Amino acid sequence: MAVSTIVPSDYKEQDSTVVLQTAMDLVSNKFHEPVKSTPLVNTVEILEDDSTMVDIPEVIAAPEVTVLPEVITVPEVATIVLPSEEGSSEKIDRSLRLSDVISSVVEPAAGAKKLRKMLLETNELIVCPGVYDGLSARTAMELGFNAMYMTGAGTTASRIGQPDLAIAQLHEMRENAEMIANLDPFGPPLIADMDTGYGGPIMVARTVEQYIRAGVAGAHLEDQVLTKRCGHLSGKKVVSHEEYISRIKAAHAARVRMQSDFVLIARTDALQTLGYDACISRLRAARDEGADVGLLEGFVSKAQAAQAVKDLAPWPLLLNSVENGKSPTITVDEASEMGFRIMIFSFATLAPAYVAIRETLARLKYEGIVGTPKHITPVKLFEVCGLEHSMAVDKNAGGLSFMGGV
């Protein structure tokens, strides 16, 4: 008994084990039966919609999975076989669209793999709006950003109402990052602030491990002292070159132990006190110890930012854009032209949120009305936060809670 397969016209090579396992999982879910598989080459028929029907004849399920080719290409496909009762020759007259399989190959919560793939397979600038809570992250996702950044300043301000002065610690940062990273298991990867790693090498390793388990795609680790402050404040102090590199070593070793694609971003705040050359030296050493990306915080000019990219090429650099901070404002186009690979906007949602909240509350205090725009209804806000998905989950499970709508 075999299941026919329709292959989309734009079907590309896929890892055979991934495609087969995904297909078998889909069939198991559809027919509520365990399945076995075997590869099969057969004829191809072009359908009206330019997809390809692969006609698969009856085959017998083997007790073990046949050895697979390295890749499956059209017309070489996988036959999905359902077990039958002894002596039965009944065929299942249903088809499985391989388009469903291909779309399902994307792995949930594989943010690190997505981010690393973006860095390795494209030369495009990865633009990450700074988000700090569920609504700001949902809004970034609604607008289709390919990646996001969890800002430490925003997390500290929103979760505990404090300034960015090393007050938020690992548990607050990890919990917030985990919530944001898992809003949508198929959503954009999340880069997070990891501050100093919250201690010595042991704590740095623990932080990386917890971030990886939380689904964070990557994080930046800096060289400030433990009593650190926001990178766009004056008076920053940094640890020695040796102590900083020990943090990087610990982070890299933890990532290797976890067998993760977690992207380790080495950040230096030494520009204020030690100068440009010391920053480049620290970043080169971090690169040599396993860091994937560099971040020189607090550029004093656009020319200096462009020079850093040249001095560290071809190693990818991340640019932190904080308007009205210590660095000049650099646009996305300018950063791309300079050769930066990632650009984060730490205050992109935090600062506008404060402005909007303050203006609204002032209107309430002095005019007695909030003045919410007519199109911003409760339903609209809940839709941004996944209302339709939640209703679909209930419906697919046989629930009746939302039959009448909301």
Which functions belong to the PLM regions below?
Residues 47, 57, 63, 69, ...:
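Intrinsically disordered, low-complexity proline-rich tandem-repeat tracts
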Residues 46, 61, 81-84, 102-110:
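N-terminal organelle-targeting presequences
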Residues 93-109, 115, 348-406:
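Extended, intrinsically disordered, low-complexity segments
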Residues 105-118, 122, 126-319, 325-340, ...:
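Alpha/beta enzyme core
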Residues 1-12:
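N-terminal acidic, proline/glycine-rich, low-complexity intrinsically disordered segments
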